[in-house]
């Protein structure tokens, strides 16, 4: 296949890009220094994997206009290319859409699901992580780097980037359209993960406004396609 991966220099995008190359596909990447808002091409791709986005919540608070520009406005040329050329599109959504009104990131991902062309799949990623990667899930990274200062009683659905890649690879070959969750359906308590990583001694913060007590993916649709996660976060840490 001829595949375009946006955000191919990012955390998830770099893994997806390398996977498709290793599988023998013709793969183009589109990322910094290019501007998605200026995206134009005469090439005919078989698949677009749109992973370019800004997930920095602090920036969303400090500069919401720029955040909207990056995640919503600059997605328009990508989606329009797919719509006009009837190209299948897999795009990054987020578990944040389930309470999209809480922060600007969730809002932009909810809008992406509305923007997306008919022949597309919105992938609602949960807490994506990988060992020793600076752009991994923030809480996981803080525990790994020993920089966390407190814990919470929350449970989170941490999904390894390798499982994300395998889900995307499967969806690339399927004819599924719509939106679906990509996670493990096996949430792990922050306290349990911290204890396994030698950080269980930290104080517990009881009040965390705006955060869900538990996140848990419903992976029924992916399981119907033959996918299941293979990595449990508690098995990857020491």
Regions found by a protein language model. Name each.
Residues 3-22:
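N-terminal Rossmann NAD(P)H-binding glycine-rich loop of SDR-like oxidoreductase domains
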Residues 26-41:
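Adenosine-cofactor binding site in Rossmann-like domains, unifying the SAM/SAH pocket
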Residues 40-70, 99:
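NAD(P)H-binding glycine-rich loop region in Rossmannoid oxidoreductase-like domains
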Residues 48, 62-89:
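NAD(P)-cofactor binding segment of oxidoreductase domains
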Residues 76-106, 121:
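Conserved Rossmann-fold NAD(P)-dependent oxidoreductase catalytic core, especially the SDR/UDP-sugar
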Residues 102-106, 110, 114-170, 196-197:
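NAD(P)-dependent short-chain dehydrogenase/reductase
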Residues 151-153, 179-180, 188-195, 199-219:
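C-terminal "lid/loop" region of Rossmann-like NAD(P)-dependent oxidoreductases
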Residues 232-238:
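Amphipathic terminal alpha-helices
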């Amino acid at each position: 296949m001829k595949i375009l991966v946006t955000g191919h220099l990012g955390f998830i995008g770099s893994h997806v890009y390398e996977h498709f190359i290793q599988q023998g596909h013709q793969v183009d990447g589109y990322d910094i220094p290019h501007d998605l808002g200026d995206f134009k091409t005469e090439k005919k791709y078989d698949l677009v994997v749109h992973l370019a986005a800004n997930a920095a919540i602090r920036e969303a608070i400090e500069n919401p206009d720029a955040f909207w520009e990056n995640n919503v406005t600059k997605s328009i040329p990508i989606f329009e290319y797919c719509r006009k050329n009837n190209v299948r599109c897999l795009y990054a959504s987020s578990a944040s859409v389930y309470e999209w009104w809480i922060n600007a990131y969730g809002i932009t991902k909810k809008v992406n699901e509305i923007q997306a062309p008919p022949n597309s799949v919105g992938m609602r990623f949960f807490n994506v992580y990988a060992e020793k990667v600076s752009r991994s899930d923030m809480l996981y990274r803080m525990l790994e780097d020993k920089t966390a200062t407190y814990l919470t009683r929350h449970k989170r659905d941490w999904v390894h980037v390798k499982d994300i890649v395998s889900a995307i690879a499967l969806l690339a070959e399927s004819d599924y359209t719509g939106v679906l969750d990509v996670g493990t359906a096996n949430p792990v308590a922050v306290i349990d993960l911290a204890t396994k990583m030698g950080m269980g001694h930290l104080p517990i913060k009881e009040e965390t406004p705006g955060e869900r007590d538990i996140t848990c993916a419903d992976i029924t649709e992916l399981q119907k396609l033959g996918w299941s996660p293979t990595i449990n976060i508690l098995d990857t840490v020491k």
